[in-house]
Amino acid sequence: MLTVQFDRLPIGPGTVFLDAGAGFGRHAFEAARRGAHVVALDYAQEEVVVTRATFAAMFEAGEIRENNFVGVLRGDATRLPFPDNSFDCIITSEVLEHIQDDVAALHELSRVLKPGGVLAATVPSWFPEKINWMLSDEYHAPHVVGGHVRIYSGTEL
């Protein structure tokens, strides 16, 4: 399931695209299908491994062209390993609520975004998120590594 409306974003042939917090790569795969040059970045090594394997299978199946794939990297959104002004479009979907220093992550994403580029960020809706926190300690940090560290309100967005 895509959590970003791709038709509203300038993603097409030649777009240099970053999926920051790619997880298992669903947004990276869609950008590659649309012809973008894709970098998928995630903090979790196991997700990086799975995403690399999925990209390889997509090449083999002819779903995407090899020149649309730049790489899948393990990295930290608060310390991105890219030069300034590297990407035309960045998606960080359902990621910021996992990052202790979300402001630092947003600064980094802005730093690597080209002037005039587009950053699309999504976070979970407040009400369902609140219910999940109440129902299970395993949903959020510190009870689970990589869990949610905050619930965003409308005013924080």
Question: PLM ranges: what are they?
Answer:
Residues T92-V95:
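A short beta-strand submotif of the Rossmann-like class I SAM-dependent methyltransferase core
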Residues F24-G35:
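Conserved SAM-binding loop of SAM-dependent methyltransferases across substrates and taxa
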Residues M1-P13:
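Conserved alpha-helix/loop element of class I SAM-dependent methyltransferases that forms part
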Residues M1, R26, Y43, V50, ...:
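S-adenosyl-L-methionine-dependent methyltransferase catalytic module, highlighting the catalytic core
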Residues H37-D42:
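Conserved SAM-binding motif I beta-strand of class I
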Residues G14-G23:
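Conserved class I S-adenosyl-L-methionine
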Residues G62-L80:
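Conserved SAM-binding strand-loop segment of SAM-dependent methyltransferases
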Residues T78-C89:
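A short acidic, Gly/Pro-enriched loop at the edge of an enzyme's catalytic core
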